[in-house]
Amino acid sequence: MQERYQPNSVEAAAQQTWQARDAYLVHEHAKNPDGSEKPKFYACSMLPYPSGKLHMGHVRNYTINDMMARQLRMRGYNVLMPMGWDAFGMPAENAAIKSKVPPAKWTYDNIAYMKKQMKAMGLAIDWSREMCACDPKYYKWNQWLFLKMLEKGIAYRKTQVVNWDPVDQTVLANEQVIDGRGWRSGAPVEKREIPGYYLRITDYAEELLDQVSTNLPGWPERVRLMQENWIGKSEGLRFAFPHRIAGADGKLIQDGKLYVFTTRADTIMGVTFCAVAPEHPLATHAAQSNPALAAFVEQCKLGGTTEAEMATREKEGMPTGLTVTHPLTGAEIDVWVGNYVLMTYGDGAVMGVPAHDERDFAFARKYGLPIRQVVALEGKTYSTDAWQEWYGDKQAGRTVNSGKYDGLAYQAAVDTIAADLAAQGLGEKQTTWRLRDWGISRQRYWGTPIPIIHCADCGPVPVPEQDLPVVLPDDLIPDGSGNPLAKNEAFLSCSCPRCGKPARRETDTMDTFVDSSWYFMRYTSPDNDQAMVDARNDYWMPMDQYIGGIEHAVLHLLYARFWTKVMRDLGLLNFDEPFTKLLCQGMVLNHIYSRKTPQGGIEYFWPEEVDNVYDAKGAIVGAKLQRDGSEVNYGGVGTMSKSKNNGVDPQSLIDTLGADTARLFVMFASPPEQTLEWSDSGVEGANRFLRRLWALGYAQREAVGRGLATGADWAQAPAPVKELRREVYGLLKQADYDYQRIQYNTVVSACMKMLNAIDDAPLPEGPAADAARAETLGLLLRVLYPVVPHITWHLWQDLGYAEHLGDLLDAPWPHVDEAALVADEIELMLQVNGKLRGSIRVAAKAPKEDIERIAAAQEEVARFLEGRPPKRVIVVPGKLVNVVG
């Protein structure tokens, strides 16, 4: 055994041994030595995009997964921890444009490097199950399931107003528009009408919503709430404003009815205007004879189509000059075009009730529209000068200024008004959803080809199943001028499967969220080229623990739930939800330093380029560049980012201090679900702990060897030996509890305390002490092994544990020796007349009389009672004794 800890050689030796043994190769229905079947546990991290290098967020995510997998394997579980690559997507195309190499080469080069990094981290991954989204063997099943959904009517083609990213030249789902900008390019999103394929996720809205509360108890409450809000169930009234507006053909537009949906039918008597979406037929009709309105409509199309954007965009409108009729009063209601109205939600029109809707209130105040109060609260005075929250209270109010409906509470008003509108054939109660069908068509090259052939005679024709996969050419180099598939005759040209005539392939590819909606099931059946999944999927799924960022709460997780339910309904699996438990790890943060450039931009600096300036309390209040002493702005801490120069390269850390140091720091610095602030001193502290562990093993190697060979009679052991065992087993009990709670930072804390206890224990020479050293250090190595597997495995080998107890890879999780936790003696606080004066040690099972006698005989008692005899002695078992005099 070498005297000094050398992480590079230690980690290389361990990894070579594990790889030679296929240590993490997993099979279904694994057996215990007695022939019984091991329980399964499937723990999986969200698959990474192969961007080129791992970042610290990856290191944290995968270390959490690895700790869980290793510890549960020690507990006797058959544990699956796989890995794959979310390899399709726009970054590969953008990189190809820049470097003039095919996206396939860029992607596979990145995968090779990142896989090497993962292996250097010592992750317990079963690489035999590796999948890659851009592999035809994988995306064949995207295409196959799409065709099955097409057969069932779950997939369909339509033309719709969509979010168009003008930079990436593709359609974005609502969830991919952030603050009106494309989630990847950051470009302002436009509205366009374009044909594409959609999946009827709305058919599953009720089940998706219901099972958030019934089937996902192991998910964070925050994520469940985000899913509930995104699905967005609303129960209300859909009704019509009649009109006599005819189109160019002389027919009434939309049969003479402007439909709206509202959850506040009790306020219908307060309608003073209606607003329609820029794409609404009434807006189109009015714009034909109104150039100003036509220009406004075009301006509205420059924005995105999400509710989130509508909530933040300034509300603007323009009157159409058209009117509709109030269905209950007969009054003429002006129709406006509003930039905040979505054609894709409901009927593309809303009623305006300024008195009781904050958005309508602001709109009416801006454009001088009437505001009519129709709900009042007792003791409250209504004013049109400023919005007050009670204006929108639907539970406490009563209707006013509403004719026959005056004096009604919310539900009574809704029911009465709904009945009256239904009697006229103008309305009915209805449930609506925020959730929209999932548009999966993307006008990009690097994605799963949509298996459709377009024939001039037959129209869109599905590719026959036997012709799958439709293989994506992997040698094209995009030039930024649209989809290269549309210019590639070898891909485009084909024959119609139905009539045999020349035809053209669909050039749109699938949204990459299709790839990530079921990859975790392909891990279970990776080598099956005849079926999407097989019986092995039934063994492993549902997944026991999923690990990934909160940023995927709506996008990926909702799509994965939907995809699972579709596969279930197609008879491919027999469960409802894919993920039993979900852990969303916190972001990794680091300090941000910047200053403005002469051109008005912002220049960011690496933390190692600056020296901090501290105040009297040690807080950072500024910073200076090391190279010239000039001041830079300190921006606090933020998520590690390439653009802000505050990332830390994991590979550099692994090369210098080792993977175990990186793993230990990211697990110790913060609970898994909370943010982690990077600290160079914390990293050094983690490395110092590992050096201490190695030094302890080296110093005690001979004693450990003797202890492993001889054993001990613990009942007869000296008191210091018993005390060490009691402390270490107490820490083991705490660590065991924290492992089960996934509180890995306190697991590491317990291990540090164990090391201190073992290192500092004043043990006498002898067999019992040697046995205690061997036992307690062995416990520490096993508890610490899931965190830092390389150093613990090496010490286990070098100190002789493997010879006596087997390889650490297969070592069982240690059991707490409850007898060791029972102390021979206990310490009681000693009080005199209720004031603390010291302590006494007594036998753990000493009778009350003995405790009273020992306490009364203490020198402190005699001194503070000034020689008076005690009047009585009060014993609080296990805590204190109070002598009263």
Curated annotation (Swiss-Prot):
Q: Identify the coding gene.
A: leuS
Q: What class of enzyme is it?
A: ligase
- NCBIfam families assigned: leuS_bact
Tell me the SUPFAM superfamilies matching this sequence: Anticodon-binding domain of a subclass of class I aminoacyl-tRNA synthetases, Nucleotidylyl transferase, ValRS/IleRS/LeuRS editing domain
Q: Which GO terms describe its cellular component?
A: cytosol
Name the keywords, alphabetized: Aminoacyl-tRNA synthetase, ATP-binding, Cytoplasm, Ligase, Nucleotide-binding, Protein biosynthesis
Q: Which EC number(s) does UniProt give?
A: 6.1.1.4
Instruction: Tell where it localizes.
Output: Cytoplasm
Which Pfam family, giving just one, matches this sequence? Answer: tRNA-synt_1
List the InterPro entries.
aa-tRNA-synth_I_CS, aa-tRNA-synth_Ia, Leu-tRNA-ligase, Leu_tRNA-synth_edit, M/V/L/I-tRNA-synth_anticd-bd, Methionyl/Leucyl_tRNA_Synth, Rossmann-like_a/b/a_fold, tRNAsynth_Ia_anticodon-bd
The family annotation for this protein states:
Belongs to the class-I aminoacyl-tRNA synthetase family.
Q: Where is this motif: 'KMSKS' region?
A: 639-643
The organism of origin for this protein: Bordetella bronchiseptica (strain ATCC BAA-588 / NCTC 13252 / RB50) (Alcaligenes bronchisepticus)
Quote the catalytic activity from the record: tRNA(Leu) + L-leucine + ATP = L-leucyl-tRNA(Leu) + AMP + diphosphate
BP term (GO), one: leucyl-tRNA aminoacylation
GO molecular-function terms, A-Z:
aminoacyl-tRNA deacylase activity; ATP binding; leucine-tRNA ligase activity
Q: Which positions does UniProt annotate for ATP binding?
A: K642
This one is known as: Leucine--tRNA ligase
Report motif location: 'HIGH' region: 48-58
